[in-house]
């Protein structure tokens, strides 16, 4: 049994590592010093991630993503994780809740635009007695 990385996985790691070094690292000092991630910078990085084929990599190809398998996705996330998390987050579309449970109308309105980088996805949770403390939910 082979436990090494496939050629595709090696390419994803190399591409993502180069992206982190060339597009994310140069902005880390500013973001960490100011505590601000400027909207213009978010849009710039997101556009470059889309151009590089790295945005929405976890989403299935049927909905416009790259369709990475779980191991390859984790390798991708590991490389992105080398950078400041706020910068890392600008490279990833995560509308998985809509993918898994959304209606066709919700997919059209939210999922596909998120995957194309036209809209931002987000998630909010609350529960009586826990508020927004996700660890306190029962």
Question: PLM features: residue spans?
Answer:
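Intrinsic disorder at enzyme termini
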Residues: 1-12
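Short, solvent-exposed alpha-helical surface patches in well-structured domains
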Residues: 11-12, 44, 75, 109
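Glycine-rich, Trp-frequent "lid" loop and neighboring beta-strands that shape
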Residues: 65-66, 105-138
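Active-site beta-strand/loop segments that form the cofactor-binding cradle
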Residues: 23-91, 116, 124-129
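N-terminal glycine-rich flavin-associated loop
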Residues: 88-105, 131
């Amino acid at each position: 049994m082979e436990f090494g990385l496939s050629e595709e996985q090696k390419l994803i790691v190399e591409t993502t590592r180069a992206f982190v070094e060339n597009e994310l690292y140069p902005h880390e000092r500013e973001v960490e010093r100011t505590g601000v991630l400027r909207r213009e910078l978010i849009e710039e990085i997101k556009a470059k991630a889309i151009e590089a084929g790295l945005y929405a990599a976890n989403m299935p190809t049927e909905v416009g993503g790259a369709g990475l398998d779980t191991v390859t996705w984790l390798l991708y996330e590991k490389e992105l994780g080398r950078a400041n998390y706020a910068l890392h987050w600008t490279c990833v579309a995560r509308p998985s809740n809509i993918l898994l449970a959304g209606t066709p109308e919700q997919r059209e309105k939210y999922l596909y635009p998120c995957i194309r980088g036209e809209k931002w996805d987000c998630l909010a949770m609350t529960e009586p007695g826990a508020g927004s403390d996700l660890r306190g939910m029962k």
